[in-house]
Amino acid sequence: MTNLRKTHPLMKIINSSFIDLPAPSNISSWWNFGSLLGICLIVQILTGLFLAMHYTSDTMTAFSSVTHICRDVNYGWLIRYLHANGASMFFICLFLHVGRGLYYGSYMFLETWNIGVLLLFAVMATAFMGYVLPWGQMSFWGVTVITNLLSAIPYIGSDLVEWIWGGFSVDKATLTRFFAFHFILPFIIAALAGVHLLFLHETGSNNPSGLCSDADKIPFHPYYTIKDILGVLLLILVLTSLVLFSPDLLGDPDNYTPANPLNTPPHIKPEWYFLFAYAILRSIPNKLGGVLALVLSILVLAVVPFLHTSKQRSMMFRPFSQCLFWILVADLLTLTWIGGQPVEHPFIIIGQLASILYFLLILVLMPITSLFENNLLKW
């Protein structure tokens, strides 16, 4: 009798995706982040579901309902902090996953890469809407500032902002619709992740060398299932340590003050994972220019495959490109730091230089360096 997992219509899909999937024999731990992102998404959906059972999306009671979850609901504090810090873990895994794609040339799988960029936008939108829900000071002023940026769009800007707000200011209608979107988007993300995997399995995984690995494949199970379980255990260790020892480390103390439209916080800033984009936004004095730079800071990833000029796919054997890659990482860390600083000297000029360097590296320096390395191969 043939094995059920190979004949059953549903099991067959699971089998070909996670059990008998031929995988390159040399993929490193950098390939663990896809599965970790899947785990993060499951954790976020489950904790979010339990939070939604007790949360009320009304401006009068939203803040109190979050307090009620933390004080009165059984293990409500744990669910709330798992959800908040789970988002941070999600973004850490996302950034590392994208970084690995850039380093090893995984962006050459065009469909997989473009759906990944779409997923990044969707996750950022979800996280932004989720930050609004506790209805603290930073929630209120964050959503006011960021949605107001849309008014920079010529002709339709002001109408668009009022349409998103559901009125003439951020109020009950805004909170209710953001809650609705925050609830539905993770399921759309899960569907997109399925399509992401579908396209990946059409081509098979890339590997650190960037060479074709068809001649040397091993089954996904047990080799990479065990490897993924190790990654998951480490993720759980970091997340639980964060939640149980220092749950507010990555949050903003201003969000423990109920939203007050009459009192502006001294420094309005988003969560840490948006700070690099926020720094790029702030570095341009013009409103529309800032909004364009903000969108392009992520959208530039979609252009990367078309700027690949190297004869080699991976950066593994390209020392000059490696140097530029790590300069890009340092630049992003600098932007993250600048995003959390007040708008004053010397932070303004540092932010502007770091923003210019960010786009310069991706659009100009990396492609030129790749061409230079191609010529080195001829020597």
UniProtKB/Swiss-Prot annotation:
One of its GO terms (biological process) is mitochondrial electron transport, ubiquinol to cytochrome c. PROSITE patterns: CYTB_CTER, CYTB_NTER. One of its GO terms (molecular function) is metal ion binding. Heme b b566 binds at H97, H196. It holds the Pfam family Cytochrom_B_C. A ubiquinone binds at H201. The chain crosses the membrane at residues 33-53, 77-98, 113-133, 178-198, 226-246, 288-308, 320-340, 347-367. Heme b b562 binds at H83, H182. Keywords: Electron transport, Heme, Iron, Membrane, Metal-binding, Mitochondrion, Mitochondrion inner membrane, Respiratory chain, Transmembrane, Transmembrane helix, Transport, Ubiquinone. Heme 1 (or BL or b562) is low-potential and absorbs at about 562 nm, and heme 2 (or BH or b566) is high-potential and absorbs at about 566 nm. The cytochrome bc1 complex contains 11 subunits: 3 respiratory subunits (MT-CYB, CYC1 and UQCRFS1), 2 core proteins (UQCRC1 and UQCRC2) and 6 low-molecular weight proteins (UQCRH/QCR6, UQCRB/QCR7, UQCRQ/QCR8, UQCR10/QCR9, UQCR11/QCR10 and a cleavage product of UQCRFS1). This cytochrome bc1 complex then forms a dimer. This is Cytochrome b. It comes from Sorex jacksoni (St. Lawrence island shrew). The gene is MT-CYB.
